[in-house]
Amino acid sequence: MTEEIDFILESTEESMNGSIAHLEKEFLNIRAGKASPAMLGGVFVDYYGSATPLSQVSKISVPDARTITLQPFEKNMLQAIEKAILIANIGFNPMNNGDVIIISVPPLTEERRRDLAKQAKSEAEDAKIGIRNVRKDANTDIKKLEKEGTSEDICKSAEEEVQNLTNTYIKKIDELLAAKEAEIMKV
C-alpha cells in the first residue's frame, strides 16, 4: 500500500483508540455502588473566578465503602465545594460539619441501577457514532486518493481494512458496555 493509505489507516486507528479511551473515562464517572474519588472527577469548584477540579482544592479520601470525605485546603472553600457538588447533580447530598465535607454514598436502588445502565448505553452509543464518523472520514480520504490516481484495488483493500478496524472497535465498545452493565447491576 502507499504511504498515504498507511497514514490514513494509522490515523484512523489512533482516532478509534481515542474514542475507546474517552468511553473508558466516561464509564469511570458512572458509579457502581462503592465509594471512590473518581465519582467526583467531573465536579468543578468556582475558585477565585475560575472553574477548578475538586481534587485541586481539597483532599479527597474514602474512609469506607459508603463514605467520601473532602478536606478543603482553605476553610473558606467549604460552601463553594458543597454548592459545586449539589450543582453537579451526581446524586450526592454533601454534609458540611465546619471542617470537612462528608458525602454518604447511598446504596443503589434497582431504578437507579437501570438509569445508570441506560446512561452507560448512551455513552457507548456515542462512542460507536464517533467510530463510524472516523470510518466515514477515512473512506472519504481513500476515495479522494483513488480520484488522484491511486489503484482501485489498493483503495478497496484499504476500505476493507478500515471496515475491519471499525468492526474490531465496535466489538470492543460492546464488550466494555457489557462489563459496565454487569458491574452496575451487581447487587
From Swiss-Prot:
The compartments listed are: Cytoplasm
| PANTHER family, per the entry | MITOCHONDRIAL RIBOSOME RECYCLING FACTOR PSEUDO 1, RIBOSOME RECYCLING FACTOR
- Keyword Oxidoreductase attached: no
- Say which family it is in: Belongs to the RRF family.
What are the protein's UniProt keywords?
A: Cytoplasm, Protein biosynthesis
The function of this protein is: Responsible for the release of ribosomes from messenger RNA at the termination of protein biosynthesis. May increase the efficiency of translation by recycling ribosomes from one round of translation to another.
Answer whether the UniProt record assigns the keyword Repeat to this protein: no
**What is the protein name for this chain?**
Ribosome-recycling factor
Q: Name one GO cellular component term.
A: cytoplasm
- List the Pfam families: RRF
Which lineage? Bacteria, Pseudomonadati, Bacteroidota, Flavobacteriia, Flavobacteriales
Under the heading InterPro entries, the entry gives: Ribosome_recyc_fac, Ribosome_recyc_fac_dom, RRF_sf
Q: Which GO terms describe its molecular function?
A: ribosomal large subunit binding
Q: Which GO terms describe its biological process?
A: translational termination
